[in-house]
Amino acid sequence: MTAFPTCYGIIPARYASSRFPGKPLADIAGMPMFWHVYQRAARCPELCKVVLATDDERIAQAAHRLDVPFVMTRPDHESGTDRVYEAACLLGRDLESSGKAGLPDDAVVVNIQGDEPALDPRMLSQLVAPFTAAKDGARVRVATLAMAIDAAEAASPDRVKVVTAVNGDALYFSRAAIPFARDGGVQAGDAAAGPAYLGHVGLYAFRLEALRAFTQLAPSSLERREKLEQLRLLENGIPIRVVPTTYRTHGVDRPEDIGIIINLLGENEG
């Protein structure tokens, strides 16, 4: 087995949101949403440190009050991934200023969505596992999760689908229902071929060098067409290992999602 790399979890938390302004501070059972995400991520034993990355003083003040570690990032990032990379650089500088070595290029940085307060910590453990695989862990640069979905879910362009190679690396991500069944109808998955459709779960783990490479690449043509930033990696020859999961989570896109989350949290605690 490959030696386990140092793993850091970073939760990007942006106040501005067209559909839900102030989302990270949304009250869920008496605590802000980012607190729930942090508490769940901190339960992942493989993560040596979890921090919030924000550009907003209101979020920073709430994090300070609740003893949630945070770093302040620039407000002009085009994506959460760019914010995560800046936060990783800041963590490295903090280590260096304390007399320790900074983050090595093979360190693993996990981008933990700040609107997933019902996140199961076991998903994060699954996400970082490929980096230590005995066969090819050393070559894994980026990893993400996917789960089996049915045809109705696959038909929605809001549900991103992924197809993979035999070794588990992503071949393509799309909003279209892939793979297409040429003979009509929907092909049910079988034991050999796997499920008919894999739905992408938007958690990512990067080697630091791959995260840096992503931020230095221009948006790609397929990325612009599908509005999926992970295609930038594939178009530039950076492989993404796809890990199957059976754990479900539920993101918060709109205020009305809060009630669903409260019910999920109650079920999980019960």
From Swiss-Prot:
Pathway(s) of this molecule: Nucleotide-sugar biosynthesis; CMP-3-deoxy-D-manno-octulosonate biosynthesis; CMP-3-deoxy-D-manno-octulosonate from 3-deoxy-D-manno-octulosonate and CTP: step 1/1; Bacterial outer membrane biogenesis; lipopolysaccharide biosynthesis
Subcellular location: Cytoplasm
MF terms (GO), sorted A to Z: 3-deoxy-manno-octulosonate cytidylyltransferase activity
Main location: cytoplasm
GO cellular-component term (any): cytosol
Entry EC no(s): 2.7.7.38
Catalysis performed (reactions): 3-deoxy-alpha-D-manno-oct-2-ulosonate + CTP = CMP-3-deoxy-beta-D-manno-octulosonate + diphosphate
Keywords: Cytoplasm, Lipopolysaccharide biosynthesis, Nucleotidyltransferase, Transferase
InterPro entries, per the entry: Cytidylyl_trans, KdsB, Nucleotide-diphossugar_trans
Gene Ontology BP annotations: CMP-keto-3-deoxy-D-manno-octulosonic acid biosynthetic process; lipopolysaccharide biosynthetic process
HAMAP family: KdsB
Family: Belongs to the KdsB family.
Primary role: Activates KDO (a required 8-carbon sugar) for incorporation into bacterial lipopolysaccharide in Gram-negative bacteria.
Protein name: 3-deoxy-manno-octulosonate cytidylyltransferase
Gene this protein is translated from: kdsB
